[in-house]
C-alpha cells in the first residue's frame, strides 16, 4: 500500500508483552517459554508472555498466590517487576523508532505513534522494516499498524 501526496499517514508501534519481552531479552534461555511479571511485592500478575497466556487463564492483576502452584507445574517463570529495566528498554525502543521518522509521539512505555506522512515507500514493507530493525537493535518483538487519512 503506498500513499499519495495529499494523504496523512500514521503508524502505531506497540511492543508485544513489553515487560515479559524485556525479561526474555536478557534471559535468552526463556525466549519462547512462559514468563510472567509480577507487581511490586509480587502480589499479582501485571504482564505475561504469549506462551504464558496460552497455558494459564491469567487476567490482569490476578493474584499470584492463586496461580503460583499451577504455574510452577507448567514451567512458568515469574519475575519481580523491574521498572528501571523497562524504562531503559523503552528508551531504546523510542530511539530506534526515531531512525524512521522525526515525527513521533510516545503514547506509553511500549507504544508510539509515528507520522509517516509523505513517505514514498510501500507502507507494509516499511512496517516490516521497522519491526525487523526494532527486533535487531533491541530484541523486542513489535507490532506495527498503519492508517491513511
How does the language model describe each region?
Residues 121-126:
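Short, conserved charged micro-motifs
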Residues 1-113, 119, 130-138, 146-149:
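Residues that scaffold, gate, or flank divalent-cation-dependent active/transport sites
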Amino acid at each position: 500500500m503506498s500513499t499519495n501526496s495529499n494523504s496523512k499517514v500514521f503508524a502505531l508501534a506497540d511492543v508485544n508483552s513489553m515487560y515479559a519481552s524485556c525479561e526474555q531479552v536478557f534471559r535468552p534461555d526463556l525466549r519462547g517459554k512462559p514468563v510472567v511479571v509480577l507487581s511490586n511485592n509480587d502480589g499479582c500478575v501485571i504482564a505475561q508472555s504469549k506462551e504464558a497466556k496460552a497455558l494459564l487463564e491469567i487476567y490482569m492483576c490476578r493474584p499470584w498466590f492463586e496461580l503460583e502452584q499451577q504455574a510452577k507445574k507448567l514451567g512458568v517463570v515469574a519475575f519481580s517487576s523491574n521498572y528501571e529495566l523497562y524504562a531503559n528498554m523503552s528508551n531504546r525502543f523510542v530511539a530506534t523508532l526515531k531512525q524512521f521518522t522525526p515525527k513521533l509521539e510516545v503514547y506509553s512505555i511500549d507504544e508510539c505513534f509515528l507520522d509517516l506522512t509523505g513517505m514514498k515507500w510501500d507502507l507494509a514493507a516499511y512496517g516490516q522494516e521497522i519491526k525487523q530493525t526494532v527486533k535487531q537493535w533491541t530484541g523486542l518483538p513489535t507490532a506495527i499498524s498503519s492508517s491513511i487519512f
